[in-house]
């Protein structure tokens, strides 16, 4: 084989190496920006990128390592959505300033955390130094459709003041997870005891009412609130509010007065679900 043939192969190899480097750089850009886009947008971009690449390079399979990394990115994104419950549905950004090593961009995000919708906007200041890039978030504004989630107002105000998006999303995820757990628990008892359990505010409400069809005027209200402390940690707070006819109140006043304290003791001993179940059984409300 003469030298001209070798030269052809060497030229072809060099071209392929340059294409691989170009694709790798493009992939790194996608990876860096992926956190600002919804999962649908990322998946659409990945598919479009794959289609364009295949059309441009028919007869040549894509580099296996790049294809594997793209598939890994898809799996990681899906895992994060399932793990955190946070799904970004829309994102937009606008460059407000770009001078020398300083860049200011305005971002708008909206999405859902479990069943809790949210939207926010902020400015991202990036300063390029010789060795690294420093970033800071300013003018953070958060809007959450609180509705029955009034306890979120102080949490949102603190997050806006601190400008810590990571802490905001982490604590919001924990809060939304507890709300989802409450919703599922209430629905479970409503399905198990349909003639006894009532959800006055629907499945997203913060309390249920237990009524005995055989005891008109007697009911127990289980209130399940969420407490968010200064650090953003969510703690469930449950209480029992009995309502009884006047005659029964006079006859068993001590027992009725002690009912909330007994319920709180059961919560500590057995946990939320078992405490509610035991309450139903103890007061003779089970069918």
Curated annotation (Swiss-Prot):
It is found in: Nucleus; Chromosome, Centromere. Its main location: nucleus. Residues 1-37 form a coiled coil. GO terms for cellular component: chromosome, centromeric region; nucleus. The keyword Nucleus applies. Keywords: Centromere, Chromosome, Coiled coil, Nucleus. GO terms for biological process: CENP-A containing chromatin assembly. It holds the Pfam family CENP-P. InterPro entries: CENP-P. It comes from the Eukaryota. Belongs to the CENP-P/CTF19 family. Component of the CENPA-HI complex, at least composed of CENPH, CENPI, CENPK, CENPL, CENPM, CENPO and CENPP. PANTHER family: CENTROMERE PROTEIN P. Component of the CENPA-HI complex, a centromeric complex involved in assembly of kinetochore proteins, mitotic progression and chromosome segregation. This is Centromere protein P. The gene is CENPP.
